[in-house]
Amino acid sequence: MSEKKPILPQGLSRNPAFSPGVQVGELLFVSGQVAQDDHGEPMGINDCEAQTRQIMSRIQAIVETAGASMKDVVKITTFLTDISNYPGFSKVRSETFPDSPPASSTVVVAGLVRPEFLVEVEAVVHLP
């Protein structure tokens, strides 16, 4: 088995329980990201589109720290707390991946780690 390498971008809030990303061989696994600032405070309250933009920015920071780009994302899994937020999420997803979108799954859940969070996204990346 390949060695696991944690990916820890500058500026992202840290959680001692998990790494923002873990590289194993040519794959990078990005932990579920929520819309929080660098101090762990929620952003984009009641605005799924704004939250998704912040999440994609966080994912991009992790991906770029590993030496890849958003074009290298091959799969995302999204968790929404309300299906009515799907259009806002979908708009940002389409803007983030305009040419060759990754495989994508969306799951509606009862809630996320904090009630302010409307969306969470995790990703798998094939490193160049």
Model-derived features with residue positions:
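N-terminal presequence-like segments and the immediate start of the first folded domain
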Residues: 1-57, 61-74, 80-128
